[in-house]
Amino acid sequence: MTASSLRTLRNILRELRRASPSTGPVREVFGYKFLLDEYRKTRNADEETVKTYQRDASYYLCLLKNERVKKELHEVYKGTGERPVEEVARMVGFKLPKTYDSS
């Protein structure tokens, strides 16, 4: 295994651990044994097969990261009903001008 494939494997396991409800060791994470077995199979594979596995693993890692980020964003911005204009403007980075009462 190359250094980049090991890095990808570690990152996948890290993302799976974050997504897992259990707080135990990484060996208890769903899919841990399967991933290690798949990575061990590629040890003796030809270069084209290894590239295919690495590409698929990086896609899977991207999927896991984006799912985690989506959940985090949903928690921050989940629907709370109608929001005031000032709050929505602040959320998207705008600053509304101050309004003065002319009376």
UniProtKB/Swiss-Prot annotation:
GO cellular component, one term: mitochondrion
Signal peptide (UniProt feature, chain positions): none
Pfam families reported for this sequence: Complex1_LYR_2
Family statement drawn from the similarity comment of this UniProt entry: Belongs to the FMC1 family.
Name recorded for this polypeptide: Protein FMC1 homolog
